[in-house]
Amino acid sequence: MFSLEAWIGLRYLRAKKRNGFMSFITMVSIAGIALGVTALIVVLSVMNGFQKEIRGQLLNVAPHAEIGYIDNTDTDWRNLLRFTENRKGILAAAPYVSNQALLANAGEIRGVQMRGILPSEERKVVEYGDKMPAGKFEDLIPGEFDIILGVGLAEALGAEVGNKVTVITPEGNVTPAGVVPRLKQFTVVGLVKTGVYEVDNSLAMTHIQDARVLYRLDKEVAGLRLKLADPQNAPALTATLIPEAQRDAVWVRDWTYSNRSYFEAVELEKRMMFIILTLIIAVAAFNLVSSLVMAVTEKQADIAILRTLGLSPAGVMKIFMVQGAFSGFFGTLAGVVCGVLLGWNVGRVVAFFENLLGVHLINSQVYFIDYLPSDVDMGDVALIACISLGLSFVATLYPSRRASKTQPAEALRYE
């Protein structure tokens, strides 16, 4: 059962106000809270979805972990397998070498990350090997100096399958005329499409033996790219992968280290958006203060009568706290319902307006993806609801305290 104070507070909330402007202010404050909660849930859901989608795409094209020798203290990559074989959580390992290079064709020059791979093993650690627009890993034949390019890189160079491109390495040849760049022609035998803009526009792959020749490496030099059963557990797994005694000779890093700055930037942006959009709820709470102050002024006679009948100042305070708290509750509830529903369907809503207006709002060259993802996190929803209810409760304190100080004789003097 409701207490007397709660019953009166609810009656005041739903009763028709003599002051129409006060009713309008109350509705605006409730709508403002609902709008703020909705906006906060939708924005955080989109950022969660974006972060999750990008993480998934990166894990399809980037190694979950990498391991190699420091300063080439050992030249045989097979010795690295002793750290990964029969290790729970590691599904596959593939050798690789990697270095920077320039690719030139038809007057165009692009910087690339040149990767030497072992075709039979590379397929085990990446997801895009079966979805190549042209060619396949097995087309890389050692000694033939073949190359597979990202689709964006091939388009920028004007290169197609069967064309030859010139690879320029950072290390030059020393001649009597001075140091000249090392040049080598490679034949394009395939194209890779990962779906990640930066990768598709900078990746070039060749056979690991040809890469060693190109960069003048020992015939067995390579690191290992690892595929894990649970990529989210990569930091914990890599922390124990190398025995303490051998950490001076072997390095290991996981995907969170390689992409740390990017995900830290996204997380920082998420926090800032949370703070900024919380201010919308705070502004609505100030409106709630205004509506309650006006309610206290309108109900002076009622307060005086209740005090005369024996209601304590604390009881009067509770009446208006209940009125304000329920206003905040209704606004929060409406915001949560609208926010969750819109968060689940924001991708469809954006796609509808894109089709209606004939514009494309999400540029894959900037955001890696061409649609708006969303992931409603109920933990975020609960936190937002608690903050909204907390701000609404704080907003009731001043008007309620003012009401509790009403003197019956003064309030009834002019009635």
Curated annotation (Swiss-Prot):
InterPro entries: ABC3_permease_C, Lipoprotein-release_system, LolCE_TM, MacB_PCD. The keyword Cell inner membrane applies. Its main location: membrane. It comes from the Bacteria. PANTHER family: LIPOPROTEIN-RELEASING SYSTEM TRANSMEMBRANE PROTEIN LOLE (PTHR30489:SF0). This is Lipoprotein-releasing system transmembrane protein LolC. Keywords: Cell inner membrane, Cell membrane, Membrane, Transmembrane, Transmembrane helix, Transport. The lineage of its organism: Bacteria, Pseudomonadati, Pseudomonadota, Betaproteobacteria, Neisseriales. Coiled coil: none annotated. One of its GO terms (cellular component) is plasma membrane protein complex. It is found in: Cell inner membrane. Belongs to the ABC-4 integral membrane protein family. LolC/E subfamily. It is a multi-pass membrane protein. It comes from Neisseria meningitidis serogroup B (strain ATCC BAA-335 / MC58). The chain crosses the membrane at residues 24-44, 273-293, 324-344, 378-398. Part of an ATP-dependent transport system responsible for the release of lipoproteins targeted to the outer membrane from the inner membrane. Such a release is dependent of the sorting-signal (absence of an Asp at position 2 of the mature lipoprotein) and of LolA. GO terms for biological process: lipoprotein localization to outer membrane; lipoprotein transport. Disulfide bonds: none annotated.
